[in-house]
Amino acid sequence: MMVESASETIRSAPSGQNGVGSLSAQADGGGGAGTAGTAPAAGRDASGREAASGGADSNGEMSPAELLHFQQQQALQVARQFLLQQASSLNSPGNNDSKQSASAVQVPVSVAMMSQQMLTPQQMQQILSPPQLQALLQQQQALMLQQLQEYYKKQQEQLHLQLLTQQQAGKQQPKEALGNKQLAFQQQLLQMQQLQQQHLLNLQRQGLVSLQPSQASGPLQALPQAVCPTDLPQLWKGEGAPGQPAEDSGRQEGLDLASTAVTATSFASPPKVSPPLSHHPLPNGQPTVLTSRRDSSSHEETPSSHPLYGHGECKWPGCETLCEDLGQFIKHLNTEHALDDRSTAQCRVQMQVVQQLEIQLAKESERLQAMMAHLHMRPSEPKPFSQPVTVSADPFPDGLVHPPTSAAAPVTPLRPPGLGSASLHSGGPARRRSNDKFCSPISSELAQNHEFYKNADVRPPFTYASLIRQAILETPDRQLTLNEIYNWFTRMFAYFRRNTATWKNAVRHNLSLHKCFVRVENVKGAVWTVDEREYQKRRPPKMTGSPTLVKNMISGLSYGALNASYQAALAESSFPLLSNPGMLNPGSASSLLPLSQEDLGVPGEPLPSNGSSSPPRLSPPQYSHQIQVKEEPAEAEEDRRPGPPLGAPNPSTVGPPEDRDLEEDLGGEDMPSQPCPLIPGWKPSLLHLSYCVKPKFTVSVGSKTPSSPLPPPPRVQGSYSLPPCSYLAYGDMRGQNPAPSPGLLSGVGGGLFRCLHRTKSPSLPGVWILAAELETMRFHRPPMGDPQPKTADWV
């Protein structure tokens, strides 16, 4: 039946010649036996088709080889007509409009190769075997590429010749007309190249050719590849008219040359290549023809690995749907995560995640730079948050302080030494618990970013105490059991839901630590409530609770410095090592800690010492010199808080330990260093300059007798950054007889110091200035209730 339909299709061609030719004669000569030599080309073609039809009628069937040869002859004739029409239209560019209207058939070569009289693709698949179909496609592809290459070369030669002739004749023509013609020729050449590239990309999309990177912009040199029989309809439907409806192109089984509207000479706009029809049915049941363009664009944008697909599951925030392959994931992405309100809200949440991670990245980078600068003894230069960095950081560590997104200055700026007290409290590091009071309340923060914290694996930037209080306050009766508090944490935050449940220990620790949480026994068992008074009491920053806060809050208060005579004594005993910048790093010379009224003592209060009394201090305005100490990064106060140096324990430092895993101390500020006075004549060895830990110790300077006419200098307490393993100690020598001699003495904190050099102050009678070297490295805070270290024991 298929052969009869093919014979009827071939017989429909016009016939006007006599004689019957054999199939072999038609294959060899391409014409009929009775064709006259003077007959036109159209007559020869018609007689050849009539001979083929007569042979088909006589024999009853057509072999695949004969059908293939017949198809090649038709394609060659149509291609020749197309090339002749293109050449004639380009020879007279001024008459392009009339030529276009008069031209009967002007289509791309790949479309012109298929005619009405060819068999349908389904008939070709039934007649020819798969190897024969592959051979047919390869031959057609090779022929088409050869035709395109020849046509491309001819067009280039003709355009160059026309440009040369126009340039020679341009001396007599107006320059504007010449420029317009040259521009038109260049546009034609460019559009021809674009047309060929689009056609090649269309073939590559269908899998017929493999385009190399070097062949993307040059002449067509691609080699055809073998295709399967299922791709044959896609090859024949490779190009269609841009204005042709998709339903008509999908309904047509063969392409009609007369119905195509694409012309190679109409260069007003380059023809668009229609994408191939997608064979993946959509879940919503829409026909694939209507959505082929959308499907093809989505498949082109989807590489082998998708950012939202990994390890066999969907990485859309909060989805985690298992997908076997990428195709199933694309189907899931188009159905479950379409453009709707939910997806838009999730996208906004992801934007907030990225913004907060960028802020955290800048903060961690600044912290890393400060650490490196401290280890290398170089002053750090923190960058503002607005500058991008390339250092990876874990998102949201415990106790993270969220800086504002519009901050243009770092959190710990360098403060000049002469900064007044007016601008002191406006900056500097602060603890998270005090920062919560001035920031937006936790309830409004959680209400605004509820979806964010519920789906994103990000630690909330609040203390455990604040979160526990919020959980209790959200309930109607303002009380929760421990298990209900756990459930609130896991329900509100994905961080606690997806990570190891070590945070439960912190919750229990906070419930028992803070006095604001009250345990009440009722019928259901033990429940927890919040005492708002106690909670508000712990909100303001404690001046004695954090060394960092103490240093920063008191550094700008009004206080006096050393007496003029005491300054002269220190100036006379300057150490040459620190005055030479080449011997030590810039960061090794220390500054001394500014003193507050608490350190200076209240007027009329004796200076605490080893059982002796001291005269009342003078008022602060009598001191004119400021001494500064380089502040070191604050440590956990419950582990490293030093005890009172001399005398009874200081009640201001005794208290419950802070929640160290919840609240985070920021590093201290780097201040300009000043040389620390040491003793002339003491030359440290290389052992003294080796790197080691610098402990915290106390320096006490006093007068020998209460009746001394000179006022005693203030007591200095703080951390010193001196030459490694070389420490300066001003000993309080009141009541010491005889004078101290070099040897071992015990320092505050349990360490031993070796006295290297001693000298009397030339201005202050009874005051000894000592230089001591660290003997042992055991420095720790004495346990509660233990006796404080004794004062200096001289050997």
From Swiss-Prot:
CC per GO annotation: nucleus
Subcellular location: Nucleus
SMART domains reported for this sequence: FH
GO molecular function: DNA binding; DNA-binding transcription repressor activity, RNA polymerase II-specific; identical protein binding; RNA polymerase II cis-regulatory region sequence-specific DNA binding; zinc ion binding
Origin: domain of life: Eukaryota
List of residues that carry Phosphoserine: 58, 92, 546
InterPro entries tied to this protein: FH_FOXP4, Fork_head_dom, FOXP, FOXP-CC, TF_fork_head_CS_2, WH-like_DNA-bd_sf, WH_DNA-bd_sf
Residue spans of biased composition, Basic and acidic residues class: 292-303, 628-642
BP GO terms, sorted: embryonic foregut morphogenesis; heart development; lung secretory cell differentiation; negative regulation of lung goblet cell differentiation; negative regulation of transcription by RNA polymerase II; regulation of lung goblet cell differentiation
Record's keyword annotation contains Zinc: yes
Tissue: Expressed in the adult heart, brain, spleen lung, liver, kidney and testes.
Cross-link named Glycyl lysine isopeptide (Lys-Gly) (interchain with G-Cter in SUMO2), sites: 181, 383
Comp. bias (Polar residues): 1-25, 609-627
Region of interest (Disordered), ranges: 1-62, 233-252, 265-310, 379-437, 589-671
PANTHER family named in the record: FORKHEAD BOX P, ISOFORM C, FORKHEAD BOX PROTEIN P4
Subunit structure of this chain's protein: Forms homodimers and heterodimers with FOXP1 and FOXP2. Dimerization is required for DNA-binding.
Job description of the protein: Transcriptional repressor that represses lung-specific expression.
Protein name, as recorded: Forkhead box protein P4
Organism this protein belongs to: Mus musculus (Mouse)
Taxonomic lineage from the root: Eukaryota, Metazoa, Chordata, Craniata, Vertebrata
